[in-house]
Amino acid sequence: MSAELFLTDHSLELVKQGFDAGIHLGHLQDPALITETFANHSVVLCASTDYLKKFGHPKNIAELESHRLIKISSMEFHQPRQLDDYFANLGVQKGFHLTVNDTDMAYHSAIMGAGIAPLPNYLVMPQFERGRLSRVLPDIDTDAHPVQLVLPANRHLSSKTVSFKNFLASYFRR
């Protein structure tokens, strides 16, 4: 069996574009699709250990504005996303050293020491364990959002789709 993986931060029309399945972060309301939630994710502030050695740890939200912040902004989305509004929801209006339109770019920028970024916990946990990233202001929590397998409704599941579904279930049980 082989698989083709297509990664994007853009919204897709799963059925129209002929995909067998998708992974969606957040709540999805589409009657043409069925969803199965495998996990929840939240957003955490993090920075590289090198950045924190050089610039120090902010002690509160107000101190964030004097740090180098990595802002994620995705103008193509029709509704606000958890990452886009992260700093605004905290009341932080300045300190943006870098604005990117891609979560992976923010992730790699944070690892390279460019600043403090709001990133999904599932993405940064391995880097916390390796000591490459550290949490900043760990008392700040965000609402959890589901990680969902998305499938076209009224379509028979192929063996490869069932295998993919089983793989996801196993992966997220860890």
Regions found by a protein language model. Give the residues of each.
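C-terminal regulatory
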Residues: 12, 28-144, 174
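Central regulatory/effector-binding core of bacterial HTH transcription factors
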Residues: 1-34
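Generic recognition of short, well-ordered alpha-helical segments
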Residues: 17, 33, 56, 162-163
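A late-sequence structural motif
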Residues: 136-174
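Residue-level signal for short, function-critical loop segments
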Residues: 9, 49, 153-155
